[in-house]
Amino acid sequence: MGKIIGIDLGTTNSCVSILEGNTPKVIENSEGTRTTPSIIAYMEDGEILVGAPAKRQAVTNPRNTLYAVKRLIGRKFEEKEVQKDIGLMPYSIVKADNGDAWVGVRDQKLAPPQVSAEVLRKMKKTAEDYLGEPVTEAVITVPAYFNDSQRQATKDAGRIAGLDVKRIINEPTAAALAFGMDKNEKGDRKIAVYDLGGGTFDISIIEIADVDGEKQFEVLSTNGDTFLGGEDFDQRIIDYIIGEFKKDQGVDLSKDVLALQRLKEAAEKAKIELSSSQQTEINLPYITADASGPKHLNLKITRAKLEALVEDLITRTIEPCRTAIKDAGVKVSEIDDVILVGGMTRMPKVQEQVKEFFGKEARKDVNPDEAVAVGAAIQGSVLSGDRKDVLLLDVTPLSLGIETLGGVMTKMITKNTTIPTKHAQVFSTADDNQPAVTIKVYQGEREMATGNKLLGEFNLEGIPPSPRGTPQIEVSFDIDANGILHVGAKDKATGKENRITIKANSGLSEDEIQRMVKDAEANAEEDKKARELADARNQADALVHSTKKAVTEYGDKLEAGEKEKIEAAIKELEDAARGGDKAEIDAKVTALSEVSQKLGEKVYADMQAKAGEQGAAGAAGAGAQQQAQPQDDNVVDAEFKEVNDKK
C-alpha cells in the first residue's frame, strides 16, 4: 500500500508532507521550496502554470492568473462575500448555471474545485518525485469553519486531481496533531490553536490527553470566519497606496489591472517586511502614464501605519476566540498553550492581540507554514494503520437542522458535537391528507431557517392520506468523519424512505466531476507530450551545437562530400526542431549522428594523438628529473611501528 500524503491546501500557499517512520517530512517542490504559492496561470498556448512560475508572470497576465480561489470554493455567486471579491480581483468571477461562483479565464468558465485541483496535482507530483512511486491517497485540510458545501467541493478537487481523499481534516486540529505528537509532557493539556491564514480565520480549543498510552486529541470547540485573512490585509495596503497616489498624482489606479497586479505584489512584500522592520518603502517606477508622461510611485509605510490600517481586521479575530472559549466550557486561564498557525500570525500586532486575550505568550516552536501539512500526514499514517497511538475526536463547526412549520430552524445536531455522529427525530405533516413532505436541510446558528445556509433538499413521497399530525416521519442525520452530512427520511407507517448525501444544493454533479477528471488526465497526457517534445528539442540543439563546433575545428580533414552531407543534415535537424513533431526530430537526430560518425572518429583520433604527445613529454620530463636528483648516501632506513587507535 502506498503512502497517504498530507496536503495543506491553502488560500495563499500550499504544502505537502509525509511520515517517514514516525518522523514528518515536509517535501520540497521542483523549485526547491517547502511551500508552493496557490496560484494558477492559464497561458495562451494552453499551458497551465502552477506555483512560483505562475506568480512570476502574474504582472503581465493578470486576467488569466488565478489566486485565492479557495475563498470561492463551495460558495454561491450571490453571497455578499463573493460580491465583495468581484470588485477586487483582476480576474473575472462569474455565475455558473447552478448559481455557484466560478471563474472566467480565456473564454471558458472553470469551477473553483477544478482550479484547486491544479494545485493539488502539483502537490501530488511533488510527493511522487520524492518517493519515486505513484501517490493516489491523501488527507486534505480545510478551515475548521468550512461548511458542508465547502468540504464537499474540496473533496471534489481532490478527485479531479486524481486523489482518493481518505479524510478531510480541520486545519487547527492538524496543527494540534503536529504540535502534540512531538511533545512528551504527561497529563492533560488544553491548547488554543489560533489560525490566521491567507483567506480564512479559525480558532479551536483542543484537549490533548494520555489515555492508556494513546494520545487523544479532542476538539472541545471551534469558531472562525471563512472570509478573513492575509488577502484582506493586503487589500487594505493596496487601497491606501491607491488613495495616496491619487492625492499625489491625481491618477486613479483602481481600474488599471496591470497596475493592480504590481500593487498586490508590493503590498504583500511590504506587509512581510513590516513584521521585522519599522518602515518599508514601496517603489514602483512606470506604474502608469498620462498625457504628461510616465508616473512613478514612491511611498514609505511605517509599521504603525499598517497596524492602523488593519486594526479592525485583527480585532475581528478576538470575538470568535471569546465564543470558542465559552463553547468549550473553559476559562481563558485554563489554556496551557497557545499555538499560532498561518503566515499572518508572524505580524507582531497579531501576536500582541493574542497575548493580550489569552494572557500568555504563544509557543514559538511550531512552524506556522508547515504544521498543518505535517498534521495531515500524521492523520494519513493513522488511517493507513502505521500509527495506532493516536485518537482524533473532531467536531462539526456549525449546527445542522431542518426547516419546520413557520420557517423555524429545528436543530438536529448542534455545533461542536463530536463527529462522526447520528441523530434521529420524528416529525409529522402540517396539512390534512398531505401526500409528500419536502425536507430542507440547513446549516447555521440562526433561529429562522432562511437566515442559515441551505445545504440541500429532497422529497419523501407516497404518504397515505391522513389527518395532519398523524403520519410519523423519522428524519435522521448522520455526519461522517469528514464532516460531510448524510440525511434520511422514513415514513414509519409504510416503511418508505429516501436518503441523500448532501452535495450542497448545487455543487458539481457526478458527470461534471468525471468530465473534469478526464480533462485533467488529458492535460497530464498533453503535459507529458510537451515535456517529451522539449527534451527532444534540447537533444537536437545540443547535437547541432557540438557538430557545428567539430566541423569548424576538423572540417578540413573531411572530404568535401562528407562535409556537405553533415551540413545538410544539420539544416534538416534545425528545421525539424522548429516544428512540433517529436518523431521527425528523433529521426533527424539519428540521421545527423550517422553522417557525422566519420567526423567523430577524426575528433577522437586527434584527441588521442594530443594525449599521446602530452604523455610522452610528461614521461621525458619525469625521467630527466629523476636523473637530476643526486644519490644521498646518508639516507637512513627508519623502523616504524603501526599505531592502532581503535582501542
Curated annotation (Swiss-Prot):
Cystine crosslinks: none
Modified residues (Phosphothreonine): T200
Triggers of expression: By stress conditions e.g. heat shock.
Keyword annotations of the record: ATP-binding, Chaperone, Nucleotide-binding, Phosphoprotein, Stress response
Region annotation (Disordered) ranges: 611-647
Bias kind Basic and acidic residues: ranges: 638-647
SUPFAM superfamilies: Actin-like ATPase domain, Heat shock protein 70kD (HSP70), C-terminal subdomain, Heat shock protein 70kD (HSP70), peptide-binding domain
InterPro entries xrefs: ATPase_NBD, Chaperone_DnaK, Heat_shock_70_CS, HSP70_C_sf, HSP70_peptide-bd_sf, Hsp_70_fam
Tagged with keyword S-adenosyl-L-methionine: no
Extent of Low complexity compositional bias: 611-631
Domain of life: Bacteria
Family listed: Belongs to the heat shock protein 70 family.
HAMAP family linked: DnaK (MF_00332)
Listed name of the protein: Chaperone protein DnaK
Gene: dnaK
